[in-house]
């Protein structure tokens, strides 16, 4: 879960901040009034390579978790076991190695 939060915070901080502000401002109706912002976080994170890789590798537990959330909107705590299975799978996924990470590469010795 820490990895997912880090990716979300790093690449989707604007969306995450907007959603958090909406939830805080509308404690009675956040699930309805902030849904569009929740979806913007989902769109943002879905475009990140590690998230796409997790969704592919962990499709089955992810779909079960999403289904549980839809069925238990008012009691998401009922989905703890589904979440645990998904996160256990997600933690096993390694980020794709990319030669162009934007970090400086050492020069070859001459």
From Swiss-Prot:
Residue numbers covered by motif Cx9C motif 3: 58-68
GO cellular component terms given for this protein: mitochondrial intermembrane space
Keyword terms, alphabetized: Acetylation, Disulfide bond, Mitochondrion
Motif window: Cx9C motif 2: 34-44
InterPro entries referenced in this protein's UniProt entry, alphabetically: CHCH (IPR010625), CHCH_domain-containing_protein (IPR052848), CX9C (IPR031731)
Chain positions of motif Cx9C motif 4: 79-89
PANTHER family per UniProt: COILED-COIL-HELIX-COILED-COIL-HELIX DOMAIN-CONTAINING PROTEIN 5
Protein name (record): Coiled-coil-helix-coiled-coil-helix domain-containing protein 5
Organism of origin: Mus musculus (Mouse)
Phylogenetic classification of the source organism: Eukaryota, Metazoa, Chordata, Craniata, Vertebrata
């Amino acid at each position: 879960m820490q990895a997912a939060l880090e990716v979300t915070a790093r690449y989707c901080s604007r969306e995450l901040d907007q959603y958090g502000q909406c939830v805080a401002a509308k404690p009675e109706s956040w699930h309805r009034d902030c849904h569009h912002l929740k979806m913007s976080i989902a769109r943002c994170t879905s475009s990140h390579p590690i998230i796409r890789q997790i969704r592919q590798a962990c499709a089955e537990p992810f779909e079960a978790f999403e289904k549980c959330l839809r069925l238990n909107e008012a009691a998401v705590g009922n989905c703890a076991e589904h979440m645990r299975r998904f996160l256990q799978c997600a933690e096993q996924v390694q980020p794709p190695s990319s030669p162009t990470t934007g970090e400086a590469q050492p020069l070859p010795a001459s």
